[in-house]
Amino acid sequence: MAVKIRLARMGAKKKPFYRIVVSDSESPRDGRFLEIVGNYDPGKDPAEVNVKESRLLEWLSKGAKPTLTVSQLLQKKGIKVGA
């Protein structure tokens, strides 16, 4: 099972927020996930990113691959993501 760390869209129409989730790469974007490790709200000024760092680092050490968008959000937050 290939595991990805990616964004799952939540919220109302035209007012999205996102959960940062760990899921199987074959699951739908907003479908089944293994764990919620954070959230991202682009509607706030400035955009708000909250992450459970210990859980995120544990999943990264287990081999989970973040998507490009998630890795950029984590870099802005100051969390090193392996290349």
Swiss-Prot record:
Gene Ontology MF terms = structural constituent of ribosome
**Pfam families found in the cross-reference section:** Ribosomal_S16
A GO-annotated cellular component: cytoplasm
Q: Does the keyword Ribonucleoprotein apply?
A: yes
Keywords of this entry: Ribonucleoprotein, Ribosomal protein
The alphabetized list of GO BP terms reads: translation
Q: Which HAMAP family match?
A: Ribosomal_bS16
Looking up NCBIfam families in the UniProt record yields: S16 (TIGR00002)
Family designation: Belongs to the bacterial ribosomal protein bS16 family.
| Protein name in UniProt | Small ribosomal subunit protein bS16
